[in-house]
Each structure stands twice: as C-alpha cells, then as structure tokens.
Amino acid sequence: MLSKFGEKFTLGFQKLMPDAFVFAILLTLAAVMGAYFIMDRSPLAIINSWYDGFFDLLAFGMQIVLIIITGYSIALSNTVKMGIDRLTRFINTPIQVYFFVVCIGVLLSLISFGFIVITCFLARELAMRIKGINYPFLIACVYFSFNSWVLGLSSTIPLLLNTSDNYLIENGVLDQVIPTAYTLGSTLNMAMIGLLVFVAPVLMVLLRPKTPSKSLEELLTTTDENNTTTIQAEAQALKLPFNAVSDRLNNGLFLQAIIVIMGLVYIGMHFYNKGLDLDLNIMIFIFLILGMLLHKTPMRYVIAMKRASTNVSGVLFQYPFYAGIMGIMLYSGLGQKMADVLAAVATIETYPFYAYITGGLINFAIPSAGGEFAVVGPSIIEAVKALGAGLPAAEVNGMIAKASLSVAYGESLSNMMQPFFLLLVMPIMAAGTTLKARDIMGYLVLPVLVFFVVQVLMILVLPI
C-alpha cells in the first residue's frame, strides 16, 4: 500500500516538477517577488542583490565538481571494480542492495558530506551487476542517506558554534563558543544518528516499489564506454605506431609515482598535525592522490578523469543561480525578516519546532547550511536568549545548541524536496540515462513525511 503511494508521488513529480534549472529560475523569481512586496525593495536594488550574490558559490561549486570527478575516477579503477565484484557474493538481491546502500551512505556521510560520491558509484556499480533493482528508487536511497551529514564530523553549524572568534561572537550575538559536547555529542544528536543508522535503511526497504523494475540497463540510452572499452585499452590505442619519448612519459609509472609519494606524505602530515580534520579540500586531495595511485600512469588517469567529468554541467551553471537567490535573501533582508517572524512566535516549549521549520523553509532559497545560518542564526539565537532570560548560563547554552541543531535538522530534511544537493548525485548516478530530479523526488515524499513527524517529536521531547 505505502509503496503504491510512492509511485503515485513519483508520477505527480514527473508531471509537475520541471527541470532542476527551471526550478532554480522559479525560486529566483519567488525571492524577487518576496523582496519587492515584503521588503519594499526597488527592482534595481533587488537585481543588484541578485548579482552581488551570483558568484558567491564559485569556490564551493568548483569543490563540488572536483569531489565528483576525483571520486568517480577512483570507481573506474580495476581495483575498485574487482572489490565490488567480490561484494556481490554477499549482496545479491534488490532488498539487500537498498538496505546496504542506505546504511553505508549514512555511515559515510557522518564522516563527511563529500563521501556521498562514494555511495553513488558503489550503488551504480551494484545496479549494473544485480538484476531487479528499481534504479530511480536506488538513487532516492542514496540521496536519503545523505541526511546524516548534519549529524556528523562535517556538520557546518556545530563546527561554527565551536569556532573561536566566529562572526556570532564578533557581533555580540554569543559571548562564548558552544562546545560540540552540546551539539554533536548531545543526547539529541546521538538519538538522531540512531534514527538514521537503524531506521532509515528499514524504512526505505519497506517503501520499495513493487511495480516492475526500471533497471539501469534498461534506462541507459548511450553505450557506457566505461564497460565497453577499458581504460588500459584506450591508453594503448592512443600510443603512436612507433617508439616515442612522449608515449613513455604518458604511460610510464615513474612521474606519477613521484606525485603520489609527495601526496601521501602530505596526507600523513595533515592527519598527524590536525587529527581527523576533513574539509572539502583535503578530501579532494585524498581522492586525487588515491585515483592517481590506482590508475598508475598519467594517461590512464587522464582518461579516467575525462570519463568522470562528462556529466557535471548541472553543477557548473546552476550553482551561480542558487548563489543569486542567496544574495537576494541576504542583501534585501528577506531571509532575516522570515527568521524574525518565526522567532517572534516561539515559546520556551516550542522554540525547537520553529527553529526546525525556519531551517527547512529558508533552505529552499538558501540551500547551504552555513549560508542559511548566517541569515537566520542571529535572530533565532537572540530569541532563544530572550526566552531563557534569568536561567543559568549553561541551560541557555543548551537551548541555543538545541535551536541550532533544529535548524540543521530541518535544513537537511528539506534538501530531500529540492534538487540543489541532488546535483552531486545525478552526474554519477544518472550518467548515460535521461533521468531527471523529477524521476527521483517522488520516492522521497513518504520517507520525508515519516522523518518530519519523528524528528519534530524528538527535538521537542529529548534533552540536549
């Protein structure tokens, strides 16, 4: 019964949801209308705000492109493919694949949100080998597993609160840092981790479609060169018909080995000096060095990177439009206004709920946890401080931590209903197919509704 609802929601999304780029345009126009009618900004001022923000995500967009293609290139190596072949000895039915992909995706995203690319190529390779998998639903499983990143080591808001001299302290919103013991190490966050690790895989298995499968093999519209021509064969075909120094350089081990050794030395130094400090830059570097190590020669790695980068156009040109929306929300004051309205109606009992709703709603216009919290965080924290007036400082800090976590949880769950971060998944999962975000999102409606109810109850009932 529930799986039938998932199919109906999917059909509805296919009929109503436009391409991800059109969705970004519609969000832009919605932000423009809000700034004009609510904030009484002039059209020229709104356009200036849009342009001022338009290029704010260039660095982040480039990081996302690199995390996708360096991660995907690792999956194209013989070593990884042989490892996945061995894995299919133990995981060989669609139900096992759905369960395993959600479980491993949740665990990897707890380490870093960039590790979703590993989940993507693992899921795709399993789908190529195991019959009966509904591939659009498998993509939904991968994306849903991404929810756990806000609970883990790369969660932006808790790390910000624990950073000395952060902008909240500099602007007098906070007078001290909020330790991660109040956020990532809290009872509430540990319970949320348990929800994702133990409940999410079971939930997605229960909601799996019962209709005839749409396998990856059926959905492929172009020949997958990754499976028809090996990287080694292509590298060999590019050699000149006579002995040449250039071919020896292109296909030799020595040059690449030097770079790999240098990279491994730095990676070792990084973790020795900084512990388990995983930001996007070091992850990209690790993926790059590991890819070079697995592919062995410069030419093989060039071919792998070329194959991995064929489907990243969505990230390249859509992220600036989302940055433009962020600019309108930030520079027109619209995001601040929305946060103020929601914070004003909160009480000592309901403030986590309103923080959660704020995080979820504003995320549609500012789909970046750090960028969103820069807009809504000060208003929410000031409201919580007012509600906690007269209480011990430790208790107020706990309230601030709970409100901040609630924003993060709401932001993460609402990601499932908009395609911004799905742009990380589709270049790998949808390569060679005509699949769009609208083919995936319907399968996420029921899981999102279930998690919305459960998460709201948890943030209202559980202590920090």
What does each model-identified segment do?
Residues F90-E125, L316-Y331, A343-L387:
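Hydrophobic alpha-helical transmembrane segments of multi-pass integral membrane proteins
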Residues L16, A20-L29, W50-N78, D277-G335:
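Core transmembrane alpha-helical segments of multi-pass membrane transporters/permeases
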Residues L2-L11, Y167-R300, M429-D439:
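Long, contiguous bundles of hydrophobic transmembrane helices that form the permeation core
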Residues F9-I25, D56, Q96, R129-F144, ...:
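Alpha-helical transmembrane segments and their helix-start/interface "positive-inside/aromatic belt" motifs
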Residues L122-L216, M399-A403, L423-M458:
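Membrane-core helix-loop-helix motifs of multi-pass transport proteins
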Residues F23-F37, I64-Y72, G105-V106, Y143-L153, ...:
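Hydrophobic core segments of alpha-helical transmembrane domains in multi-pass membrane transport
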Residues P94-L108, T119, G132-S154, L160, ...:
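Alpha-helical transmembrane segments of multi-pass membrane proteins
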Residues L57, Q63-Y167, A365:
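Early transmembrane hairpin of solute transport permeases
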